[in-house]
């Protein structure tokens, strides 16, 4: 059961940019958030407890394959869900592992927490 959620600064910046381009993103993201709270083990497993989850959204009129990717991380205890980064597959096919590792370090040092 997820009891806390964190957002990296990079996630917040990228989300804000994507929100300008895709008006349905906030609602589509809320749907994903509810799904992840129920079952956080979704998407493709990456290293260090990270996962890449696909979102389809109404603004693009496409399925998940052409949509947005969200990189999340579960803590060892699996009670905290961290949103590391969000990107449009159209703009970027993958995110560098070194960039994701840097985001993990920054998130571990900062506490940008909501409950």
Model-found features: residue ranges?
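Arg/Lys-rich, positively charged N-terminal/basic patches that mediate binding to nucleic acids
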Residues: 1-31
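Enriched for short, Lys/Arg-rich terminal
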Residues: 2, 68, 73-115
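Non-catalytic, surface-exposed connector residues within folded enzymatic/regulatory domains
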Residues: 5, 23-26, 44-47, 65, ...
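Short, structured surface patches at the beginning of a domain
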Residues: 24, 28, 44-46, 58-60, ...
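Negatively charged, low-complexity tracts enriched in Asp/Glu with abundant Ser/Thr
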Residues: 28, 32-37, 42
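Basic/aromatic recognition patch in beta-strand/loop cores that engages polyanionic ligands
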Residues: 41-86
């Amino acid at each position: 059961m997820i009891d806390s959620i964190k957002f990296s600064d990079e996630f917040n910046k990228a989300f804000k940019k994507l929100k300008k381009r895709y008006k349905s993103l906030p609602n589509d993201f809320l749907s994903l958030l509810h799904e992840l709270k129920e079952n956080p083990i979704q998407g493709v497993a990456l290293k260090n407890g990270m996962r890449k989850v696909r979102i389809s959204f109404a603004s693009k009129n496409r399925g998940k394959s052409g949509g947005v990717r969200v990189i999340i991380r579960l803590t060892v205890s699996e009670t905290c869900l961290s949103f590391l980064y969000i990107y449009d597959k159209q703009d970027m096919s993958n995110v560098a592992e070194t960039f994701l590792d840097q985001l993990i370090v920054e998130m571990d040092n900062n506490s940008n927490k909501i409950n």
